[in-house]
Structures are given as C-alpha cells and as structure tokens.
Amino acid sequence: MIKAGQIYKEKELPYWRKHESNIFVISSIDYTACIIYKDGTVDRDIGTKWIKEDCKLIKEYPTWQEAVNSKEFRDE
C-alpha cells in the first residue's frame, strides 16, 4: 500500500526529466499522490499505478517530514 512517508526510486527516468533526481517521497495520498523530489520539486495528482509499476520502494518512515530528512533521501 502506498502511503505518506515512503521513499521511492523511479526505475527509469522519463526523457523529459533526465536532469532531475529519480528519488522522491510520498507526502500525501488520496485518490492520487503528492510527491516531493530531492531538489524540492513537488508534483501533485500523480497516479498510484505509475508508482506501483515503475518505482521501487526504498524505505518507509512514519511521516513524510522524517522521510525527507532521512539519510536514504538526502544521500541517495
């Protein structure tokens, strides 16, 4: 189950985002997800199907705030 506080890594970056990080944190989840990338970029309304199929769960924290301050997120 996808939930806030999880850190994911995209398996493959889309061609339009080759310069950005492929590590992100789930900050909220409802019908869609809101995610935060290492550079601070926030994407809203992300489909959970994409996360399930094209991303790998790295680590899980109780809150998204703990996740963005974690070693796994900062040092990856």
Model regions and ranges:
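Short coil-to-beta transition motif at edge beta-strands of beta-rich domains
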Residues: 1-14
